[in-house]
Regions:
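N-terminal Sec-pathway targeting helices
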Residues: 1-19
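N-terminal extension/subdomain marker
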Residues: 38-183
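Structural recognition of the beta-strand scaffold that forms the well-ordered cores
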Residues: 89-94, 123-128, 187-191, 234-238, ...
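Residue-level signal for short, function-critical loop segments
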Residues: 96-97, 130, 193-195, 420-422
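Catalytic-core segments of thiol-dependent peptidases
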Residues: 128-231, 240-241, 246, 263-264
């Protein structure tokens, strides 16, 4: 029997209309039986919305004058009996958003739930909302609806007035109602939607300006529902991007035993709910860790089917071990804070952190999540603290199971917020609310001060960290919102040497502040208009002398029809480079992810990804291209003003039909014409500086002349 999981990926992989029609007919067999029963469940309980101050939350972190961390939690017990024969209730907070209105992903997951093995030992209970249209005829986008899914049947239980799925009250009411009406030995909660990481949270409601549940609002929701939830939830899961962070785990400790979440972005099709139900039918006495491992394995297997596993991640975290991890982290960051009192050491630390595995893009082309791997950060800075091994062991104890793809080797299961680019005032405020260590906040504060003052720490107050924890007035930290001049100074300005290479030299005192150097290439379309062709690493750097030389040989990426592409380097290691390419794909703006492999010199399109929006909403789907898809290159256009290039607009190339034969994107010699080349110098604070451009020409034989 072909499962919904396989079919939904086949629908994505096959584009020939007659075959799609046949598959659509086959899919009718999997539409679940639907009935309406508005009398079998109780109405919402009346939740207290009068909680304020510390009472509105279940976790409170405080710090003493010596910087030691105190964690106060309103912990629930796990020993209250449930008078029920049901082993598991899985509550699903299904905030459909554009994932449903554009692709029907939420409906497909409901179908997956209905297709799972029939059993009275478990039940799915779903609240729907958050989207402007549903891909079925039994759910309305004008209201909140509640469903039960069991033994192959969907039962519509309640229809309520429209509510914002991005508000704490909405989640709290569903949680309290679900637990009261569907008691079980174990209850799990899945938050289904887009994820925006530790800053922006989860569950963006398409009908309410994409409002989302921040981590603070999640804590509020659980705290409001707490009087009606006798025991801890066995797990809280995020079928969403970017939510497996230490900040998220800290919020969930009082409310659940386990967390299941991804450090990286997820495929739009996410978890395999048929596999989850099948496992619960066979092993109803499983605990959260055992079910969490199954969720991870089935998610990864589904990603493999659709060829989206290369950067997939999913982790199961034991929340009872988080406090020990946080205590050891605070000691580690205390050492790090003490070690970075001078600009040189701070620069060394920042440069090390910049090399740590990060998640969700984190580049100027696609947007920033500012999430890096927690274990990777601690490992990279082990020389600065005697507690690094303790932290890594505690982290290993927390993450009881994880799966990750080839391109995310080395991920340790939990991320942490880190300013890969300067925070704005909103991000700063949220960081203050969710940061898990006063000394880590102090380190970030010192880093922000240095960023605003050109790397200089003169005048920095070592006592300022107490403001973050003991005072709501943050006016003294205005420098968080500033960016100073780059600390990278040149002892020799760019010039053409006798061999025709473009060169410059970094001042020896600035080398520690230099993260990396790329090149930028632009193409002259006529005498004054140029297209930006992107960035690459055609640069040789001598980190001892500071000498930098161009390594450009006239090679660039293009479509098979010869159109150069705007390719922006977003990830590099010893084995491959990954580029982001702005295009219209079937008429929709997105970014192609293109990988160049060094061992065999091959280039392939990994998929398309829509990037990170300004509100932190991360596209869930890195989706595969299919033969027959149309690609139109997009270029940023500039006007040559003589001594600078002035941005004018963007321009489109011509339509290209994707073949899928492995030769759609090629690395080859640029077409004959005039171009310009510049160095881009990135410092450790995330700032970039462009050198002067030098004009070069490519002749009909592919030779480059400056």
């Amino acid at each position: 029997m072909i499962t919904i999981t396989i079919l939904k990926r086949l629908l994505k992989l096959i584009v020939v209309i007659p075959i799609l029609f046949i598959l659509g007919i086959l899919l009718l067999d999997f539409f679940p039986e639907v009935e309406h029963d508005y009398t079998s469940t109780k109405n919402d309980v009346v939740l207290s919305n009068s909680l304020s101050g510390d009472d509105a939350y279940s976790t409170k972190l405080s710090v003493s004058d010596d910087g030691s961390l105190t964690i106060k939690r309103n912990l629930k017990s796990n020993d209250k009996p449930n008078n029920t024969n049901r082993a598991w209730t899985i509550l699903v907070y299904l905030c459909g958003s554009d994932l449903e209105s554009e692709d029907g992903c939420a409906t497909l997951d409901i179908n997956e739930m209905a297709e799972a093995t029939a059993s009275d030992d478990y039940i799915y209970v779903v609240q729907t909302g958050g989207t402007n249209s549903w891909d079925n005829d039994y759910i309305s986008s004008d209201s909140i609806q509640r469903l039960s899914i069991s033994n192959g049947k969907v039962t519509v239980l309640q229809e309520l007035e429209a509510q914002n799925m991005g508000e704490a009250d909405t989640l709290a009411n569903f949680l309290a109602w679900g637990v009261e009406n569907f008691p079980a030995t174990n209850t799990g909660l899945v938050l289904w939607n887009h994820g925006g990481g530790s800053i922006y949270g989860v569950c963006y409601d398409e009908n309410f300006d994409d409002d989302s549940l921040t981590l603070k609002e999640l804590d509020q929701a659980f705290t409001m529902a707490s009087p009606y939830v006798d025991n801890k939830l066995e797990f809280v899961g995020f079928d969403a991007c970017l939510m497996s962070s230490i900040e998220t785990a800290n919020i969930l400790v009082p409310h659940a035993n386990y967390m299941v979440a991804s450090q990286e972005t997820e495929s739009a099709y996410g978890w395999d709910y048929t596999a989850i139900g099948n496992y619960l039918a066979e092993y109803p006495n499983c605990n959260g860790a055992e079910l969490g491992a199954t969720i991870c394995d089935s998610f990864y297997a589904s990603a493999e089917v659709s060829d989206e596993d290369y950067e997939s991640t999913l982790s199961c975290v034991d929340l009872s071990k988080v406090d020990t991890l946080m205590d050891s982290l605070n000691l580690f960051y205390s050492d790090l804070y003490d070690a970075t009192t001078d600009s040189t050491t701070l620069a060394e630390v920042s440069r090390s952190v910049s090399e740590v595995l990060n998640f969700g893009g984190n580049n100027s082309t696609e947007g920033y999540t500012n999430l890096i791997d927690l274990g990777g950060m601690v490992s990279s800075l082990s020389e600065y603290s005697n507690y690094s091994d303790t932290v890594l062991q505690s982290l290993n104890d927390c993450v009881v199971y994880s799966r990750y793809g080839e391109d995310r080797q080395g991920s340790t299961g939990l991320s942490i917020l880190y300013p890969l680019t300067s925070f704005d005032d909103y991000e700063y405020t949220i960081l203050k609310d969710v940061c898990v260590s006063p000394y880590y906040m102090s380190y970030i504060d010192r880093l922000s001060y240095a960023n605003a003052n050109g790397g200089n720490l003169n005048g920095y107050s070592n006592d300022v960290w107490s403001i973050f924890w003991n005072n709501d007035d943050s006016s003294q930290m205005d420098y968080w919102l500033e960016s100073g001049d780059s600390m990278v100074l040149l002892s020799e300005q760019p010039y053409l040497d006798d061999d025709g290479y473009y060169c410059f030299t970094i001042n020896s005192d600035s080398l520690d502040y230099t993260q990396t150097i790329y090149c930028n290439v632009m193409q002259y379309i006529d005498d004054t208009n140029v297209y930006d062709l992107g960035t690459d690493d055609y640069v040789y750097i001598d980190w001892n002398s500071g000498q930098v030389t161009d390594g450009f040989d006239g090679m660039w990426y293009s479509l098979a029809d010869g159109q150069p592409l705007s390719t922006y380097l977003v990830e590099q290691n010893d084995d491959y480079n990954i580029y982001s390419v702005p295009v219209l794909l079937n008429g929709e703006y997105t970014y192609l992810r293109v990988q160049y492999s060094y061992p065999d010199g091959t280039t392939k399109i990994l998929g398309a990804w829509d990037g990170i929006q300004d509100n932190g909403l991360s596209s869930r789907d890195t989706y595969s291209l299919q033969a027959g898809d149309t690609i139109v290159p997009i270029y940023d256009c500039y006007i040559d003003q003589g001594d600078y290039y002035d941005y004018s607009d963007y321009s489109y190339g011509t339509e290209y039909t994707y073949k899928g034969d492995g030769n759609d994107v090629l690395l080859g010699v640029l077409p004959k014409g005039d171009y310009c080349y510049s160095f881009i110098i990135y410092d450790i604070f995330g700032q970039s500086t462009y050198s002067d451009y030098v004009i070069f020409s490519v002749d009909e034989d592919g030779q480059v002349y400056y």
